[in-house]
Amino acid sequence: MARQVALDRVRNIGIMAHIDAGKTTTTERILYYTGRLHKMGEVHEGGATMDWMEQEKERGITITSAATTCFWTPKYGNYAGLNHRINIIDTPGHVDFTVEVERSLRVLDGAVALFCAVGGVEPQSETVWRQANKYGVPRIAYVNKMDRVGANFFETVKAIRERLGANPVPIQIPIGQGEVFAGFVDLIRMKGIIYDKEDGSTYTEVEIPHDLENEARTWRINMLEAVSELDETLLEKYLNGEDITEEEIRTVLRQATLGVTIVPVLCGSSFKNKGVQFMLDAVIDYLASPVDDGEVEGHDPKTEEPIVRQPKDEEPFAALAFKIATDPFVGKLTFFRVYSGVLNAGSYVLNSTTGKKERVGRVLQMHSNKREERDAVYAGDIAAAVGLKDVRTGDTLCDESKPIVLEKMVFPEPVIEIAVEPKTKADNDKLGMSLAKLAEEDPTFRVKTDEETGQTLIAGMGELHLEILVDRLKREFKVEANVGQPQVAYRETIRGTVEYEGKFVRQSGGKGQFGLVVLRVEPLEEGKGYEFVDEIKGGVIPKEYIPAVNAGIQEAMKDGVVAGFPMQDIKVTLIDGKYHEVDSSEMAFKIAGSIGFKGAAKKANPVLLEPIMKVEVITPEEYLGDVMGDLSGRRGHIEGMGQRAGAQFVSAKVPLSQMFGYSTDLRSMTQGRANYSMEFESYREVPRNIAEALQEKRVGKDSE
């Protein structure tokens, strides 16, 4: 099957937003207008197509980034009349599902940032915006819910500029706001669009209403000045008062959007069917195709030499697996983005991350959770493969004769853990396998066994994250489990630098054991994890024993010296040592490495760390004092406060250990009128009195 659409007419986009900005409804409307849906599903009725997990339908929030494909032919603009393929990744807006947003942004060429015209820029919008900045994703902004009481387009534009540090340039302004929202002025064509009151999908083009002429002129000048600054020819025309064509404006707007220097802003009400078609035109006009994104960089798995691949079908096949999902009908699905080349169904691919070769059984293009078989997928496509057993999120799939490893995805470490116990013997048998499947899908979800108690512990990014995973155990895998109290994932590190000798000797006749290492341990900056450096000179320790020393150190780091928590952000340098020709072995050096590290860590001013969360609360003014007092009482540090959409907001940094059950407390404190968001910020040293209490607790547990 040949390529259906030329590569420069493909758009891989994400829709990113805060919860309740209307993301799922907007996606539904896109699918409806592009002919993919015959009936629209409303989130508040629990019928939306993109939200295909049971809990998503129940909770009205999107958890997994479902991928779907559709076609659109713009009516206006530089690409009018040309058919385009749009692949949409629907991303969740809840902060516990950061990993879903992160991995979708990695494979996108552009995004539609959705804002609620009433709420403006919410805390989660900032988080997602920062993630998009990290990956340099071009964006257009769509101010949704213009029909709601209290909607304010211009305040939202101002908030995008002030709170997100972006450069928003409206290319539309609304005709009426709130209940009187009737349409918009197109500032490029200088025409009014009035929607049919009964059916928002039909509209009439009109002259700009008299009372809006001045405002429209002002905002058009604002737009022209913004684009003229980026193009000398346009600037000259503008300064000389010459006419600038629609095509010229769109061309420079596109360049500026792709360069992430401008964010074109549109408005609408997806629920009322107003604005979605024009937003789709803007996706085609201003967001990148895989061709604009250009080459992708990677390296040779053997030589580490840099390799570059062009987004062309003729290039060798290279793709990134960005999501693993379990489908009730076909089993394990691997979602992947093709960066170069062609993949035929039934062919073999090399997983260059692991070095394993696997056969792709079938290739599916997903429409939400419905499937469409494809014989082949091409550069720029997003699809799902059936039959890949050992692929994990972030792995590279490629042509085995031309191997390449693409840049890996980096995921945050979990900050909260709970114990799970199966309710029955039958549940016990299925628990391990079910948890392993969930961990395959989600890299921020970890499963481990507590060696002291034998309990199974699951770790994740927040209470809601773990709650939903336990819920999935029950629904998808039919495993009933009792859940313990949430526990904080404390960590340990060191503050000083120490050199220490680790020695393991057993020599009492016959074959003995001998390993001696000298280690230097020192702190690394936060988030760097662990670094091992081999500085052995003159073969005082043979090369084959050095990996064993490293393994011994890493094993010792799992069980810290302050209170037995894992250690992090430490650099260890192996500077000297001794070996015995007969008695030395890998095991002896592994134990010596472990002894040396433990001894050094005890002397290097070890400290206990706790996860600190960034908390934002939006509350009516009358509860502000109570909310702030409560946060301070939780060892919180108030960072800032201000007004937001008729309410007050407070931002604070609070230890995670103090935030369990906060949603219930906040609800009762404010009669359910406040809401909050919380995300992991960093690890910070635990105050001495709390560290001592934790140590006693651990020691007490050990002596039981």
UniProtKB/Swiss-Prot annotation:
Gene3D superfamilies, per the entry: 3.30.230.10, 3.30.70.240, Elongation Factor G (Translational Gtpase), domain 3 (3.30.70.870), P-loop containing nucleotide triphosphate hydrolases (3.40.50.300), Translation factors (2.40.30.10)
Molecular function GO labels: GTP binding; GTPase activity; translation elongation factor activity
Gene Ontology biological-process entries: ribosome disassembly
Places the protein is found: Cytoplasm
Ranges of residues in domain tr-type G: 8-291
Listed SMART domains: EFG_C (SM00838), EFG_IV (SM00889)
Residues where GTP binds: 17-24, 90-94, 144-147
GO cellular component, one term: cytoplasm
UniProt xrefs under Pfam families: EFG_C, EFG_III, EFG_IV, GTP_EFTU, GTP_EFTU_D2
Keyword field: Cytoplasm, Elongation factor, GTP-binding, Nucleotide-binding, Protein biosynthesis
PROSITE patterns per record: G_TR_1, G_TR_2
HAMAP family in the cross-refs: EF_G_EF_2_B
NCBIfam families: EF-G, PRK12740.1-3, PRK12740.1-5, small_GTP
Described function: Catalyzes the GTP-dependent ribosomal translocation step during translation elongation. During this step, the ribosome changes from the pre-translocational (PRE) to the post-translocational (POST) state as the newly formed A-site-bound peptidyl-tRNA and P-site-bound deacylated tRNA move to the P and E sites, respectively. Catalyzes the coordinated movement of the two tRNA molecules, the mRNA and conformational changes in the ribosome.
Family to which the UniProt record says this protein belongs: Belongs to the TRAFAC class translation factor GTPase superfamily. Classic translation factor GTPase family. EF-G/EF-2 subfamily.
Protein's recorded name: Elongation factor G
Gene source species: Chlorobaculum tepidum (strain ATCC 49652 / DSM 12025 / NBRC 103806 / TLS)
Gene: fusA-1
